[in-house]
Amino acid sequence: MPAAYAHYRFGAAMLSTMPGDISRSVKRYRRLYDVGLHGPDLFFFYNPLISTKAGKLGGKFHSQTGQEFFTRVCRSLRLEPSEAGQAYLYGVLCHYCLDSLCHPFVEDMSREGSVGHIQIESEFDRFLLEKDGKSPACQQDISHHMQLLPEECAVVARFYPGATPRQIQAGVKNMALVKKMLATKDGKSRDLLAKTIGIASKDYAAFVMKAEPDPACAHLDDGLFALYKNAEKAFPELLLQLGAHLTYNAPLGKDFTPTFG
C-alpha cells in the first residue's frame, strides 16, 4: 500500500473529478474526507509499539475486499443516512482505489528483492514530495490534515465494527504525532528515532525517511507512479459504482473484488 503523502495527494487530486453534490459534501466535512484518505491505517497508530486489539483492526479491515467493506458500510448509511459519513466514505474510496492497484506491485517487489515493503512506500512518498517541489522530502510535516472532532470520531467508528470513537480519536491523534516526529529537522534526532523504532521491528526503521534517496528503490518509482496514474483514471468509475450502490443498492463491479491490501 502507498504511504501517507501518496494517499493525501491522490485524494486532493480526486476532488476535482467529483460531481458537484459530492464535492460540496466533502468540502462541508473536509476533516472527515481527509482522514478517510488513510482508510483503516489509523488503527496501526493506535499504539504502534505494542500489539493491541484495536491495532489489529488495521490488518482485519485491510484484508477485506472492496465488495465486503463497502457493501456493509453502504447498508449502514442507507439505514441511517449521514452526509458526514458519506464524506468519510469518499475518502476511504480514494484509499481503496490506490491501495488495491498499487499493493500487489509493492508486495511483489518486496518479495523479489532486498528492499522491504515500508522502504518502498517511504521512497515513493519521497518521489512524490520532490515531484511537488517539497524539499527536503524527509523534513516535510504532512500531519496537518490528521485531526477530528469527538463527534466526527463517532461517525468514523460506524465504519469499523469493534472500534469505539475513543479508539478512533487515539488512532488519528497518534498518526498525526508520529508523522510530525518523522519530519524532525535534527539529524541526530532522526537517527535516534530510527534506532528506537527499529527496536520494535527492523523493517519499521524505514518509516524514518533518510536524507538521501535509497538507490535500491530508484528503479521502482516509475512503476509505482504508472500505477498511481492508473488509479487516477480508475477512480471516477469506482465513484460512480459506489454512488449507485449507496443510492439504489446497485451491484458493485469487479473493480471492488480486490482487498485493500
Where are these regions (language model features)?
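N-terminal leader/auxiliary helical segments
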Residues: M1-L89, L93, C97-G261
